[in-house]
């Protein structure tokens, strides 16, 4: 990977919020959730960009759906989730849905590029 290309990405920032353990009001809870949602949207948009790059790079349409890679991603996510204290009951279905939607997006991008 080109180090200079990697440094061109702006650092992800999350708006100021109260730590969940310190929240005393529902307004504080909602502000925290909203701040995290805005950050997640930015991350998901960037992830989508990588799916578009994959569609451009992959040599054939069959390469878009890679069952082995899906299971590798889920395993890595679950390991990271456990370290972060995120429940498997949230992490696994969220990522499986995310992967499914990203693959659908990648197929559409692949077809559009080769139209």
Give residue ranges: language-model regions.
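Domain-level signature for soluble enzymes in the chorismate/prephenate branch of the shikimate pathway
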Residues: 1-115
């Amino acid at each position: 990977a080109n180090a200079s290309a990697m440094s061109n990405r702006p650092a992800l920032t999350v708006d100021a919020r109260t730590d969940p353990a310190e929240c005393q009001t529902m307004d504080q809870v909602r502000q925290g959730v909203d701040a995290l949602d805005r950050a997640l949207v930015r991350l998901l948009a960037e992830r989508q960009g990588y799916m578009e790059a994959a569609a451009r790079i992959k040599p054939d349409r069959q390469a878009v759906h890679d069952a082995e890679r899906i299971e590798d991603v889920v395993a890595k996510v679950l390991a990271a989730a456990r370290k972060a204290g995120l429940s498997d009951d949230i992490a696994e279905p969220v990522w499986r849905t995310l992967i499914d939607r990203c693959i659908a997006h990648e197929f559409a991008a692949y077809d559009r590029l080769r139209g």
